[in-house]
Each structure stands twice: as C-alpha cells, then as structure tokens.
Amino acid sequence: LNVLCNNPHTADCNNDAQVDRYFREGTTCLMSPACTSEGYASQHECQQACFVGGEDHSSEMHSSCLGDPPTSCAEGTDITYYDSDSKTCKVLAASCPSGENTFESEVECQVACGAPIEG
C-alpha cells in the first residue's frame, strides 16, 4: 500500500493550474480538483496503488495477524509484527519469530492486518 494514499490534497497550488486527480476516499478512489503533483492521474492507478490487487482489503485481517508476537532472543533480529492491543504494526528489536505473526516490513504488516498507514 502506497503511503501517498493517505495524503490529503490541498486547494492551494501556488499559482499552478489545478487538474482532476484521484484520491483514496474510504474504500474507493474519487476524482477531485488538485495540484498536478498530488493524487493519481486515473482511478485505476489510484486503486492499484492504494488497495491490494486493486481491491480494498481493509476490513479483512490475515490469520497471521492474530498469532503470537515474536519473542526477545540473543541472536535475534528486528522483526515487524501486528500488536492486536494497539491495532498497529510494531518492530521488536533483537527478536525471534514465535509463530506466524512476523512480516518483512511495516507496510506488509499494515496491508495484511488493516493497520493504519502512517507517513
């Protein structure tokens, strides 16, 4: 999921012309006048960037998100996992996997678990 999907568009373009661009609005992409550097040129481009496989999966949670978080261990590495209490993805330093609740990156965790994308 592209972090630009959560960026709001602005009305002030500093004398640049506004054009119709597409922005994520909930579970779809809608057109709105914006600066040329914002949003996406087409609805398809917006959907491909903002939704897994072009579809909204925000209400679905991958089963690995519900597993046990990693545990601390001496020979471990930084592991990203889903924290079901805070409903966010976190990184635990010097940890070892203790189940399926491990992800290659924070973005992968956020997409799989429906956690908010920050940025």
From Swiss-Prot:
Tissue: Expressed in salivary glands.
Gene Ontology MF terms in the entry: serine-type endopeptidase inhibitor activity; toxin activity
Record's protein name: Ornithodorin
Subcellular location: Cytoplasmic vesicle, Secretory vesicle; Secreted
Alphabetized UniProt keyword annotations: Blood coagulation cascade inhibiting toxin, Cytoplasmic vesicle, Disulfide bond, Hemostasis impairing toxin, Protease inhibitor, Repeat, Secreted, Serine protease inhibitor, Toxin
Predominant cellular place of this UniProt entry's protein: cytoplasm
GO CC annotation: extracellular region; transport vesicle
